[in-house]
Amino acid sequence: MNIKKWIKKSIQKLSHVDNPKFESELLLSYVTKHTRSFIISSDEIQLTEKQYKYLNHLIHRRSLGEPIAYIIKEKEFWSLSLCVSYDTLIPRPDTEILVERALSKIKSNSACILDLGTGCGAIALALASINSNWNIIGIDKSENALAIARINASKLNFKNVTFFFSDWFLNIKKKFNIIVSNPPYVSKKEIKFFKKDIFFEPLSALISDNNGLSDIENIIKNSKHYLFYGGWLMIEHGWRQKVKVQYLFKKYNFHEIESYQDYGGNDRVTIGKKYDK
């Protein structure tokens, strides 16, 4: 079977996903080791029997709801190709808002930045790609996730980012200009209404107690001990949590509190500045 016919067949099997043609091309790229642009321009290429069988196996996995990123073990974030696994959340485009906000507040060429709950390292590595002089630390309490983050840093050859184990601030011994975090913020009640593909991701990185606010409050409460005077805390949160998150920033004496929307127009990131010493 040639690529063109296989894509047509695959689109029918994946008719329930948002972009079946795009995902079919990604799977072809993964199996044939050709770029997606090459596949698009060379649709008469014949698949081997081995490739055909493997592609059908992958299509079956995708039809059951498994995210394409886990199938091809890769996800693009901030134009970086990142390895992902079942131990890491899949980076979302909306999290790039967190990176953009951090970039807008970094004033020093030698800034120190902490990424709490780094997962595959997406936020830390995006920031590391901007300025090699910045000192960036990413922490996580999952050793398996940290292994993926280190693989990504090595693959990208970034020398200005370090990943190590810490349960939030437990093993942090220094202060930072910027602290960023995409923590668990989904409540146990909410999770049941999500699409089924979310259940392939590590629930410990998604669900938080106290209606999704437990980890957020923990970070806001304790981060002031790890920020320099004038430092910024930036947190991603649920689209209906802005008011409560802003309240927590005020409760723990942050200033210049602002919230920002994601690409879909939903409240997604809140930031605050430390003024007290």
Curated annotation (Swiss-Prot):
Annotated GO MF terms: nucleic acid binding; protein-(glutamine-N5) methyltransferase activity; protein-glutamine N-methyltransferase activity
Pfam families, alphabetized: MTS, PrmC_N
Xref: InterPro entries: DNA_methylase_N6_adenine_CS, HemK-like, N5-glutamine_MTase, PrmC_N, RF_methyltr_PrmC, SAM-dependent_MTases_sf, Small_mtfrase_dom
Binding site for substrate: 182-185
Uppermost EC category: transferase
Assigned EC number: 2.1.1.297
Catalytic activity: L-glutaminyl-[peptide chain release factor] + S-adenosyl-L-methionine = N(5)-methyl-L-glutaminyl-[peptide chain release factor] + S-adenosyl-L-homocysteine + H(+)
Residues that bind S-adenosyl-L-methionine: 117-121, 140, 168, 182
Keyword annotations: Methyltransferase, S-adenosyl-L-methionine, Transferase
Gene Ontology biological process terms in this record: methylation
Stated family: Belongs to the protein N5-glutamine methyltransferase family. PrmC subfamily.
Known role: Methylates the class 1 translation termination release factors RF1/PrfA and RF2/PrfB on the glutamine residue of the universally conserved GGQ motif.
PANTHER family: HEMK METHYLTRANSFERASE, MTRF1L RELEASE FACTOR GLUTAMINE METHYLTRANSFERASE
Record-given protein name: Release factor glutamine methyltransferase
Protein source organism: Buchnera aphidicola subsp. Acyrthosiphon pisum (strain APS) (Acyrthosiphon pisum symbiotic bacterium)
Gene name for this UniProt entry: prmC
